[in-house]
Amino acid sequence: MKYDLICAYCDNRGIGYENNIPWKLSDDLKHFKSITTLNNNGKKNIVIMGRNTWESIPTQYRPLNDRYNFVLSSKVDFVDSHKTDFIGTSFEIMINYINSKQDLFCDSKIFIIGGEMLYNYVLTNHLNNIDKLYITEIYSSVECDRFFPKIDNEIFKIKEVSKFKKENDMFFRYFVYEKRINNNTDDNTDNTDNTDNYINEEELNYKNMIKDILENGLVRDDRTGVGTISVFAPYSMKYNLEDTFPLCTLKRGFLRAVFEELMLYIRGQTDNNILKEKNIHIWDGNTTREFLDKRGLKHLPEGDMGETYGFNMRHYGGTYINCKSEYGKNGFDQLEYVINEIKNNPHSRRILINLWNPKTTCNAALPSCLHQYQFYVNTEKKTLSVQIYLRSSDVFLANNWNVCTGALFVYLLCNLEDIELTPGNITMVCGDAHIYKNHIELAKIMVERESYPYPKLVVMNKKNKIEDFVYEDIKLIGYKTHPNDLKGEMAV
């Protein structure tokens, strides 16, 4: 006999507080009813619950209509003033009763609907009999005193996931989990339909690019001395930004660092010490005294990025002195131009930022890898999209980082006053796509991992000036990821 569990829980897997559901989500209630009443055979399904769960249901809704209501209570003298279909003192008694009434229940689905003790008991003692988990993830920190057990990803895998929904200032989405084949339980039944499993198609494209480089990459020397395997101009990759944010799930991403680096560029800054003060060290290796001297930049102070990303974004063609100097209106402000075009000339095909200046790359500690953004305003859908070009992409360490940089740029622009747009998509185009030799084994491990659904990014405050955004203005919701255990050293 098989049965399903259905549950809604918040950030800490909390499911209830003082015998009540601590949120009001009408969409989730409709979802619960739809799942637990659906039966293609025209029969009523069975919902099994503990006594506390039964009593938490408002009296006007008891019993749950169009379903057989089975209530589990250890109190033999439990008397219910409302009609239940069966009261049992143990879960096994209920299952035996159902088995004894196959003429009545043979086509009924069985749903375990709570609470905490029953969920734990079934997952511990009847794991072999569980078919699916229907989970509503609510992305909110709510005080709870009852909790759902942690889902073991070695036993269960995601079968389906919905888009994000929002109600009463809470974001949530629906998951369906199924048991894996060859899991550690004694059940050898194949419950899964491998032709219809959840796939993160966008991250699959990223994995396929890595596989292409591993299988077909040309071995090349490079400036760092580490060496790479490389392909040129792999297929472009597109990520939809309307519902999710493309932060890598194969290893944990560092969104705060992506944000602070982008804001450094947006503010026209080139001083790595600003990042170091925020405990972000991605530029340390490329701004040491030794590295700058090797680049012929002995006149720049240690920590100076030189005439690259930030300077070229806000002062293109200007005269660069060092990271401590104030530049005012020196050079051309590409970001100011782009914002003005988005607001006042949205059909323009010239809404570009180019961070590559051939004349001055010799003055950069590291010439821009992500060096071009082209923005596109869809005036019908009211969306903003971007295409980014990477002349060079460290695919294991930096490719997803750069994708997230471009995506985050779109989100910030959409949340400026007087720009009434929402994020559309981002397309990544790449020149030299490579994996450093010291990352090859890590990349092989990463591409074998299963992807999770992407999270959602929410910008909570509008700003008059893009320079005024701070990290506390953004929130990442529903980020599931593998641990950050694949730590590759950056080649310098």
Locate predicted features.
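Terminal, non-catalytic protein-protein interaction segments that mediate quaternary/complex assembly
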Residues: 184-186, 196-492
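Enzymes that bind and transform nitrogen-containing heteroaromatic metabolites
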Residues: 1-182
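Short linear sequence motifs
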Residues: 16, 25, 47, 141, ...
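Eukaryotic N-terminal low-complexity, Ser/Thr- and Lys/Arg-rich leader segments
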Residues: 1-2, 103, 181-201
